[in-house]
Amino acid sequence: MAEVANNEQQGPQFNIQRVYTKDISFETPNSPAVFQKEWNPEVKLDLDTRSNKLSDDVYEVVLSLTVTAKNGEETAFLCEVQQAGIFAIAGLTEQQLAHSLGAYCPNVLFPYAREAIGSLVSRGTFPQLNLAPVNFDALFAQYVQQRQAAAADAPAEEANA
């Protein structure tokens, strides 16, 4: 009985069990010619997150970043990093858990992914690339709104069919 009371008093729990690089890639398809041109890049960042339950209260979250730099029409470099983490999360409501997996965990992983990308770009002898911080809370809120809007539209479409 005392154990149950202790567990209830502990409340929400969040532990990082492991942070690791799941996949990494760096390509310079137009080298060495790209190094001989004036450097005026257009940099595009794509990011995605996904999570899966490994066991009770243990989740893997993967943050995927793809950075593409084009110099004119040519791709200067393409860098992809999948930064992952294993998180033990307990004592949260379903909504809180979704927020943790969709925003908080990616926020923990982002500095690792940013450092990996910066290192790869530097090793490719390109000028330093500093990725700006990402507001994962805002991205998650936008995702939730889109899902709610899609759910609201679905019954209307069924009624019209």
Swiss-Prot record:
Keyword presence, DNA-binding: no
Pfam family, one: SecB
Keywords on record: Chaperone, Cytoplasm, Protein transport, Translocation, Transport
Superkingdom of the source species: Bacteria
A GO molecular-function annotation: unfolded protein binding
Gene Ontology biological process: protein folding; protein tetramerization; protein transport
Location(s), subcellular: Cytoplasm
Record keyword Kinase present: no
GO CC annotation: cytoplasm
Record text on subunit structure and interactions: Homotetramer, a dimer of dimers. One homotetramer interacts with 1 SecA dimer.
Function: One of the proteins required for the normal export of preproteins out of the cell cytoplasm. It is a molecular chaperone that binds to a subset of precursor proteins, maintaining them in a translocation-competent state. It also specifically binds to its receptor SecA.
PANTHER family, per the entry: PROTEIN-EXPORT PROTEIN SECB, PTHR36918
Family: Belongs to the SecB family.
Protein name as it appears in the record: Protein-export protein SecB
Organism expressing this protein natively: Shewanella halifaxensis (strain HAW-EB4)
